[in-house]
């Protein structure tokens, strides 16, 4: 389970600044309310794992539905809002019944549930594969979509806590041994290049 960001083992941490909760940047002002499922953990086919095998692997899912719930508050009728139980069960069913061949297929499938099964006007999903890369905590993808396609969208590929050994510094004693550096890599818009190749180019 991804419990947070750990410190570098030795002296320093090189970090590419990012916002882990991207909904604070992409949400639309006309939809002030959010219904979320956080860190749903499933096992499913989601592409190759860190050893190049096409086998079920752990997948962590965050899903956010953006809406306006004032009508439900006034009427006290559940049909006027979005049911997080419906979202949760649909995501679990998707994981159990679907064999995806890539990370982006998982993300698009979850987004389809948010917009078309749960009828959210705007949604975000964040998918993490904690066993996708040997030298990183996770590979992931963040998508933001509007049902009517009028709001801004986001496609972002993420590599979290990529561990790299590198020579740091210009002094002679600093160049005798490599130091451990931990890097977060975000690519936006998401590239078609596999995250394995991106991680290898950094590593």
What are these regions (language model features)?
Residues 2-203:
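N-terminal, polar/charged subdomain of small-to-medium soluble alpha/beta proteins
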